[in-house]
From Swiss-Prot:
Task of the protein: Fatty acyl-coenzyme A (CoA) diphosphatase that hydrolyzes fatty acyl-CoA to yield acyl-4'-phosphopantetheine and adenosine 3',5'-bisphosphate. Mediates the hydrolysis of a wide range of CoA esters, including choloyl-CoA and branched-chain fatty-acyl-CoA esters and at low substrate concentrations medium and long-chain fatty-acyl-CoA esters are the primary substrates. Highest activity seen with medium-chain acyl-CoA esters and higher rates of activity seen with the unsaturated acyl-CoA esters compared with the saturated esters. Exhibits decapping activity towards dpCoA-capped RNAs in vitro.
Catalytic reaction(s) noted: an acyl-CoA + H2O = an acyl-4'-phosphopantetheine + adenosine 3',5'-bisphosphate + 2 H(+); CoA + H2O = (R)-4'-phosphopantetheine + adenosine 3',5'-bisphosphate + 2 H(+); hexanoyl-CoA + H2O = hexanoyl-4'-phosphopantetheine + adenosine 3',5'-bisphosphate + 2 H(+); octanoyl-CoA + H2O = S-octanoyl-4'-phosphopantetheine + adenosine 3',5'-bisphosphate + 2 H(+)
Domain Nudix hydrolase: 10-242
Record PTM N6-succinyllysine, positions in chain: 300
Mutation effect (residue 112 to A): Loss of fatty acyl-coenzyme A diphosphatase activity
Organism phylogeny: Eukaryota, Metazoa, Chordata, Craniata, Vertebrata
Binding site for Mg(2+): 112, 116
Activity versus pH, per record: Optimum pH is 9.0.
Cofactor: Mg(2+); Mn(2+)
Source organism (scientific name): Mus musculus
Protein's name according to its UniProt entry: Acyl-coenzyme A diphosphatase NUDT19
Disordered: annotated span: 72-93
Positions with biased composition (Pro residues): 78-87
Amino acid sequence: MSSSSSWRRAATVMLAAGWTHSSPAGFRLLLLQRAQNQRFLPGAHVFPGGVLDAADSSPDWVRLFAPRHTPPRFGLGPEPPRQPPFPGLSHGDADPAALPDDVALRICAIREAFEEAGVLLLRPRDAAPASQEPSQALSPPAGLAEWRSRVRSDPRCFLQLCAHLDCTPDIWALHDWGGWLTPYGRTIRRFDTTFFLCCLRDIPRVEPDVAEVVGYQWLSPSEATECFLSKEIWLAPPQFYEMRRLENFASLSALYRFCSDRPSEVPEKWLPIILLTSDGTIHLLPGDELYVKDSDFLEKNMSTDKKTEEIVKEGKVLNRVVIHSPYVYEIYMTLPSENKHVYPRNYIVNKRCTAHL
């Protein structure tokens, strides 16, 4: 059984920015390439994000948000319903003085976007309430490199940076999107990661952290899928799945409206259960007829002597990612959305690279 200490809480932000160049796609997403020496997902292209630090939930943030925004929600609106915990997944008793989880996780994602990409998702403390349109990253001020080094060394310095700039983290620009838990067996490190979506009017300047990040690209969801299939980039199954979701939106404004208008529901948080077939691997997701929400499968995989094709043909109620090889995934989905979310768009590349809806 996984103890609470073996799961590291994390947050990631999918940055979707407007694209002014001539192109049929209306927005691009920031993907960072992780260095090969990283223990988790070496070489992968990922969204900015990282592990939650105690500094992200510090009550010291309250003074920075004051007087315009007051605890506990700081103007975020009603607290979203809580998802029942997975068996064996508990984060223990929270400090009663700490910020609410969804505030702290937003600060974490914003801090990591600065550390990894040099993007400042901040807004002036005296700014008017957020307008009903995509946000804008803060222009990098002088001396930012030194601050970035300090924040990387000590996350508590992010609060000091915000105070120095007389800004607050733009937590209102981050919309709930979903969450993923690392499946058993992929790595000794397992993460409970909350995904946020942030729409930006313009593409901000990016300066990758050369220690953890060796490159970056702004790609539309369809471009990212094509680059993955052509082996130009590698995406882990959660990132691939989210890219396919985002193909539902033709423009930044459509994506922003969806995020803004989506009612507060129990946020998705999915723990893939791995089914090992005789010739491949299937990541079973909640709702799939073979998915077993049982504590036994937190620490082991399922297996069968059947081939992948047999398993797929037998299924009727599906929510799964079939892994044929590192660069050939298939998404099978027959479920209606239970929480007003979108599911991966039907997008045919070739016979072996099809999202089945």
